Amino acid sequence: KEFRLAPGEWVYNFPAGLIDPGETPEVSARRELMEETGLELYEISDTIGTSYSAVGFSNETNMCVVGKARGEFKPSTSTLEEITPGWYTKAEVRELLKTEKFAARTQAFCYVWSRQ
């Protein structure tokens, strides 16, 4: 869960960020997860190809790295982000999807995952 300035409210979102020059999406995902949550991405099971964030408004693209994380949550290392990481059961996610705001891609992934 993180505070996003544009909507001016807290939304549920996956850790994310820009891919630095010379980084692969997998290296970037490991770095971003560590920076934003303190967790280590220790196993990658899939990398989902490029998609557009808002195809009608922007050429910004996304990639999704799927894997397993371990460790203890730690405060974000960024002074520009307010992030509250957490673990959720599938039942908790199904309830959150009914009552809380999500980033669009996070909402879609959580919907599918929570029903498996």
Question: Residue ranges of each PLM-predicted region?
Answer:
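A glycine-rich, hydrophobic loop/mini-helix early in the fold
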Residues: 1-9, 13-16
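Unchanged
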Residues: 12, 16-106
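Short, amphipathic C-terminal "tail helix"
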Residues: 108-116
